[in-house]
Every structure is written in C-alpha cells, then in structure tokens.
C-alpha cells in the first residue's frame, strides 16, 4: 500500500458489507456489444449475430466500422416471416453460414450469437452450431452463445463467449503448474504482463481468449488462473469444472491493484519476495510518478457510479485509494462477492454500494448529491450533461486499455479529462 492510501478505512470483512439491492427499470447495452472488442482480439474468428436490424445497427454503430471495411462480424437479419414461423429459420441460417465461409476462407472459428429476437422464437443455436461444426470441421469450428439483452448487461457478452469456449479447450497433459490469464486484454497490455511474468520466472503463462483460435490454452487440474476482468463468473465456473483453480486477487487497475494481482500469481508459484520487488519496482515507481500529475485535479472530487460495466468496484477502489476521490455511490449491475472479495476489502468501509438498478431512484439520488463526475451509460450521459453535470461514458472504460502499471495514468486521465473540459467551458 502506498502512503496516499493510508488514510482510507477499509472494510475488514467483505461479507459483512451492507449493499443496497435495487430491482427496477435499468439502462444498459446488451451483450452483443462485447463483439466490438472480441472480434479484434480473436483475429481469425467471426461473430454472426442472429437477430434484427436493430441488432445490426447497434453493432455497426458501436464498432464505428467504415462502409468499405470488411469486419469479422455480421448479422443474419430475422425478418417478420421468420418471427411468425412462416419459414424454417435453420435452413436460412445454414444457407447464410455456407455463403459466409465460402466467401471468407480466413475464418477458423465461427460464433453464432443469439439475440432477443432469436430467443423469443426459441431458435436453438446450440444445435445449429453442432450441426454446422460437424459439416465444416476441421476447417471451421462453430460455437454459439447468447448476447441477448434480456436482464443482462453488456459485459456479460464476453463472459458468455468465453464460457462457450471452455468445454472445447484442450486438456493439459503435463504435471507442471501453469498460469492462465482470463479476460480480454489489449495486445499491448498482454505483452507488458508477459514481460513481468517472465521476469518473475513464471514462464508457463497463457492468455484466454488468445489472439487466434489456433492458440487456445490447455486446461486441467494443474492450471491456476487469474481473472483480468471482474465480469466473468460463468467462465470461471466452467474453468473450475475443468479442474482449474482461481487465484484470489484484486484486479489489475492502478498501481495497487496491479501489484496485488501480480503478487497473487507470484505467491502461487513460489516467487521470492525480493525478486518480486526487483521485477515490479521500476514499473511501480514509473506509474506512481505518472499518477502524480492527476492527483491535484482528482483529489477530493466526488464520484457517482451508475451500474453499467461491472468494472465499478475495482475502479472505485483505484480512484478512492490512489487518487483520493470521494465515493458518493458505487452502483454495479451484479456483485460477485467471491470474485470481488479482495476489492471489497480495500474499499472505504462507508462506501455506499448498490447492486442492480432502479434508474429513476438512482437519478434522484444523483441529482440530490450533485457529484463532481458521474460514470454512466451513453443513454444517461447527455441528459445529465444538459443538467450541468460532468459525465464519463462507462463503455469507454471497457474499450480503452486500462490494465497494468503503464496504463494507470491513462486510466486516471480518463476521469481528469471531463473535469478539465468542464472547467474550460465554464471559464
């Protein structure tokens, strides 16, 4: 813990923390949004959404793909006759997939992604994926998962995608312990972590999802895994069913979180404390210095999180402990107490945490509190800006590389920038 965190009073027992639970109208994107970063990560995969024109517009808008680009996602649009049961949706899906694979021979992994419309008509994409995978094997593997927005939030799309992959991961055959880092990370962040793990002597490290489908990690009883993202409960459960063991750790946001995350791996692999300090200290010092220029702008600022990305708890820990921001309310769509236990220990004991959403009630509390900055979804940002509040889009925190030491200052800047912009507008 650095000196700047010493004044915080942390809760000693995460299970004893009082959490407000709300169930009402919510304001979030659906899981289809995860395709935007997943299609960039797995470079020989294609994501075929089986949905409506609204689904197609959402993905196209979120990805910002230009009309002359050829992305690795698309939508098999369901028309009214499909929804009415006047056509065989499976025959049409087979035709579209056959055309797609013939046109794009670079595709090695195809995901059929369910949506609200496909789930409403009970289209069984898992059976379709099995049928198509048998047809196009071994050149193309076909899997399915749900990106439906019914009672979900947008980061659950990645969880569903990775969970669908775990059962088909190869089984590890060796007896040597290996480390698996779970959750999409930008390539630059992944490379930084590889260098740190190599320095610590943890050489057998794999990342999931990998950069291409031919590099899928092996999993077994000797696999220890670190979650790089806090929104992967289904993936973690599937890995545990394969015998892998999760390492309890905070998430790698900021200096403190990254150090705790790396230390969990170091302890599990018997790395000497002196070696750990030697390897991590240069990056820690560099990150601390980079954060200094944002502390004056952010210290004492009051912060309100609407539930959106499931990153809220680790972000609140980073901003309160390393940048001395005050937490008015930390809303999160779902609170997995086991996976977030190390984070909850570090949050101020008096932090107000809300699980779930009743957007009208939360808007009332936000307006009453008048925080300095509000982290929320796109649908709430513009109305709140019109009311004179400063906002930060929650989805930007998922699209931007923010994990690790070298990105700590970039993460801080994401919160400082809106405040600086507001100050200039007022002036």
UniProtKB/Swiss-Prot annotation:
The keyword Nucleotide-binding applies. InterPro entries: LIPOR_BchN/ChlN, Nase/OxRdtase_comp1, Protochl_reductN. Its EC number is 1.3.7.7. Its cofactor is [4Fe-4S] cluster. Binds 1 [4Fe-4S] cluster per heterodimer. The cluster is bound at the heterodimer interface by residues from both subunits. Keywords: 4Fe-4S, ATP-binding, Bacteriochlorophyll biosynthesis, Chlorophyll biosynthesis, Iron, Iron-sulfur, Metal-binding, Nucleotide-binding, Oxidoreductase, Photosynthesis. GO terms for biological process: light-independent bacteriochlorophyll biosynthetic process; photosynthesis, dark reaction. [4Fe-4S] cluster binds at residues 30, 55, 116. Component of the dark-operative protochlorophyllide reductase (DPOR) that uses Mg-ATP and reduced ferredoxin to reduce ring D of protochlorophyllide (Pchlide) to form chlorophyllide a (Chlide). This reaction is light-independent. The NB-protein (BchN-BchB) is the catalytic component of the complex. Protochlorophyllide reductase is composed of three subunits; BchL, BchN and BchB. Forms a heterotetramer of two BchB and two BchN subunits. Belongs to the BchN/ChlN family. This is Light-independent protochlorophyllide reductase subunit N. It comes from Rhodopseudomonas palustris (strain BisA53).
């Amino acid at each position: 813990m650095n000196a700047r965190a010493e004044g915080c009073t942390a809760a000693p027992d995460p299970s004893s923390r009082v959490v407000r639970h709300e169930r009402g109208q919510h304001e979030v994107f659906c899981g289809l949004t995860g395709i935007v970063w997943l299609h960039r990560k797995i470079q020989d995969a294609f994501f075929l959404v089986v949905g409506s024109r609204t689904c197609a517009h959402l993905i196209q808008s979120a990805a910002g793909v230009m009309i002359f680009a050829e992305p690795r996602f698309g939508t098999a649009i369901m028309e009214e006759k499909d929804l009415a049961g006047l056509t065989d949706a499976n025959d049409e899906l087979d035709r579209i997939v056959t055309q797609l694979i013939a046109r794009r021979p670079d595709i090695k992994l195809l995901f059929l992604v369910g949506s609200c419309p496909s789930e409403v008509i009970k289209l069984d994409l898992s059976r379709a994926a099995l049928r198509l995978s048998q047809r196009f094997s071994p050149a193309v593997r076909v899997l399915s998962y749900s990106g439906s927005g019914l009672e979900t939030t947008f980061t659950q799309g990645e969880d569903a995608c990775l969970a669908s992959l775990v059962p088909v991961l190869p089984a590890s055959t060796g007896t040597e312990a290996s480390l698996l880092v779970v959750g999409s990370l930008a390539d630059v962040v992944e490379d930084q972590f590889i260098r740190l793990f190599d320095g610590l002597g943890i050489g057998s490290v794999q990342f999931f999802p990998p950069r291409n489908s031919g590099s899928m990690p092996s999993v077994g009883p000797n696999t220890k895994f670190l979650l790089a993202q806090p929104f992967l409960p289904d993936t973690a459960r599937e890995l545990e069913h394969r015998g892998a063991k999760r390492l309890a750790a905070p998430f790698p946001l900021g200096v403190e979180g990254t150090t705790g995350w790396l230390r969990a791996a170091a302890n599990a692999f018997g790395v000497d404390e002196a070696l750990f300090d030697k390897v991590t200290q240069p990056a820690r010092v560099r990150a601390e210095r980079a954060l200094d220029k944002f502390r004056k702008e952010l210290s004492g600022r009051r912060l309100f999180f609407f539930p959106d990305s499931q990153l809220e708890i680790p972000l609140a820990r980073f901003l309160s402990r390393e940048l001395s921001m005050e937490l008015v309310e930390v809303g999160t769509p779902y609170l997995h107490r086991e996976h977030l236990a190390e984070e909850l220990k570090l949050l101020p004991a008096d932090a107000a945490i809300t699980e779930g959403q009743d957007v009208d009630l939360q808007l009332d509390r936000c307006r009453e509190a008048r925080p300095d900055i509000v982290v929320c979804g796109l649908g709430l940002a513009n109305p709140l800006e019109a009311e004179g509040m400063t906002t930060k889009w929650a989805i930007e925190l998922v699209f931007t590389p923010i994990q690790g030491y070298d990105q700590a200052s970039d993460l801080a800047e994401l919160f400082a920038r809106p405040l600086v912009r507001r100050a200039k507008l007022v002036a």
